[in-house]
Each structure stands twice: as structure tokens, then as C-alpha cells.
């Protein structure tokens, strides 16, 4: 990495955002914070902005702006405060910004991620919805505007590192030459050994108790259901131009092998490392060079053994639903994601049983298939279908 980079961290108070700021702080000679954004943890945003000397912060509304100013250290000049969703997209495209960490969870992060791609930025993509809900649209924007796309999910980042170097960050339209298949690994979450019949009474706290990773509550539930892995299958399809029949999922409880690439000659390349998101984040920030991340060395002798197994689709029906949606097309993927967000929100707030998350998604996919054909040629088209699916899922009487 030869040039100095000013980074916008969108979703800075989440786990990815916090880890990103940790890595940036380790390399003041190469990286600086341009902008930060948060939705609800405004006091933490003020702490981050003060510590990182951010030039800009983005908050959702006027009330959040007042909260930010109230939390700002007395006697210090505050950063520029921008307000609203359009301000978020404008900040992602700002000429003063070189790199955008797109780490806002959910469909709310899609417009800003797309704006960054359209502005030709280096996009560090941690927001799944940009590809799950708008894969074709997003990849076209990357190609048309000369943006760089570096996946930050540990699995996709691992695959990226194991692929041939040519064109990896430029939204390829064909699978990399010589690659037979992609193998995504999954921890299996907290219920890997549970009988499916015992999952009916699962509580939100149980679902959020991930054995290996420290994550937010929504993504922790997605990991427990393996819908998260299903979304990653869809992402891998778009990131690496790989058809679904050449993408496989394996449960790997130790979360040491982050994913693998199998080549036509039978070789399998894997990326291993500690389960710490600072590794893929530092890779994205430093690409094509490598930066120190603060992650300790991997002691394979301590691990002793690494296990792999095929996922049980009776225990993880959401994974099968994701493959079904990918084969059905982009509209089904939009419906899958929207229905899951509604269902997980209902589960976390105590309005839906854990085992009904997959039922809400399945019902939404059936509903989407009954609709007249839709075109998803613009962000407005995607967001309209997203909203319609949310309304349908919310009216099921299940959420």
C-alpha cells in the first residue's frame, strides 16, 4: 500500500467498526479516519470521534445530533455532523475519502455501500445486503466506476486470499481460471449438537452465545440458524462469479480454517488464523500489502485437531432456504434477507420462537414466487421489494 488512505467507517460502533478503528490506530503513518457513523450508540460515537480525530460524523436525526454534542468533550471543536440517510451515502462518496468500510448491518447499509462503489472508492465490504439483495447492481457499479472491492467477512476474505491474484478486487464476471469449487466453513454455532426437536424453547441469549466469535446480536442469531452462512453463499456467488453448485459449506467447529479453494488439479488452498476480525480488516486496509493487525500467532499444536462435517439441514433449514433463493434468482434473495431481518427482530424481542424463523423465511419465499415478475435494475426497485417483503412477513401473525 503506497498511498495514504483516509477511511470512512460506516457502522463504527459495531464490532466490525471497533475492530477497524483498532487497526487504523496502529498505522497512523498510512491510515487516518475521515468519517464515522452510528445509528443508536451516539455517546460511543462521540468517544470514537474524539479519539480518532474524525473530520465527519453521520447520525440518523436531529435528536442524535444533540446527543452527540452533549457527549462531546467540553472545550474541543466537534467534527462536522451530517444528518440522515442521504448524508450517509454522500459521505461514502465524498471526494476527501479514499476507502469505505461498509459495516452497517442490514438493508440500511445498502445505499451507502452502493454510493461508495459508484464513486470508485476502495470498498471494504462487511455489509451482506449489498450483494445478497443487490448483487448484480452492486457488481456492475464496481466494474463501471473502477472501484476496488475487498470482502471483509472472514470466509470471503479467506477465499480472496487463496485465489489467483489477477482481477480479484475488480468484480470478476467469470470464475477464476483453474478453480473447481469454493468451500465455506462454518462453526455450526451454539446448537451444532442439539436435537432439532429441542430448539423450540431456545432463548435470545442462548442463540447469541457464539462459541468462537464476538459479534452483534442479529448476526449471532443468523450464525445460530446458519442463515448467515446461506447469505455468505449468495455473496460468494457474486464476489467470485461462482455458480451455486460449485459452492460448498462445511462445519468446522474450531473456526481456524476460514475457508478453502479447490483447484482443478486437486490442490486445496486454505487460509487459517485466529478467529479475530482484525485479520481480514487489516488485509483489506493494506491490500496488496499486509499490515500488522494486533492478532496473535496461531498455535496449531495447541489446537491439536481440526474437525469438519457436513451440515445437518434438518437442524439448519435456513441454509437450504438460502441455496433455494440463490437458484431462484435475485428477487428471491431480496425476499430471503428481508424476511429474515423481520423474523430475527421478532425473535430477539420475544415475539417469535426460534424455530419459526425459518418458517417466516419459507413463507416469504413462497409469497415472492407468486408475485408477478419484477425487475431489479435500480436501488429503488430493490428497496421496494425489500419493503413489500417486510410488510408481508410482518403481517403473517408470526412477527
Curated annotation (Swiss-Prot):
Sites where the protein binds NADPH: 13-16, 127, 129, 216
Presence of the UniProt keyword NADP in the record: yes
Enzyme Commission designation: 1.1.1.267
Keywords, comma-separated and alphabetical: Isoprene biosynthesis, Manganese, Metal-binding, NADP, Oxidoreductase
Family classification: Belongs to the DXR family.
Binding of Mn(2+), residues: 153, 155, 232
Catalytic activity entry: 2-C-methyl-D-erythritol 4-phosphate + NADP(+) = 1-deoxy-D-xylulose 5-phosphate + NADPH + H(+)
Purpose of the protein: Catalyzes the NADPH-dependent rearrangement and reduction of 1-deoxy-D-xylulose-5-phosphate (DXP) to 2-C-methyl-D-erythritol 4-phosphate (MEP).
InterPro entries: DXP_reductoisomerase (IPR003821), DXP_reductoisomerase_C (IPR013644), DXP_reductoisomerase_N (IPR013512), DXPR_C (IPR026877), DXPR_C_sf (IPR036169), NAD(P)-bd_dom_sf (IPR036291)
Keyword NADP: yes
A GO BP annotation: isopentenyl diphosphate biosynthetic process, methylerythritol 4-phosphate pathway involved in terpenoid biosynthetic process
Binding-site list for 1-deoxy-D-xylulose 5-phosphate: 128, 154-155, 187, 210, 223, 228-229, 232
Name of the molecule in the record: 1-deoxy-D-xylulose 5-phosphate reductoisomerase
A Pfam family of this chain: DXP_redisom_C
Recorded metabolic or biological pathway in which this protein acts: Isoprenoid biosynthesis; isopentenyl diphosphate biosynthesis via DXP pathway; isopentenyl diphosphate from 1-deoxy-D-xylulose 5-phosphate: step 1/6
Disulfide-bonded cysteines: none
Molecular-function GO term, any one: 1-deoxy-D-xylulose-5-phosphate reductoisomerase activity
Cofactor or coenzyme needed: Mg(2+); Mn(2+)
Main EC class the enzyme belongs to: oxidoreductase
Originating species: Bordetella petrii (strain ATCC BAA-461 / DSM 12804 / CCUG 43448)
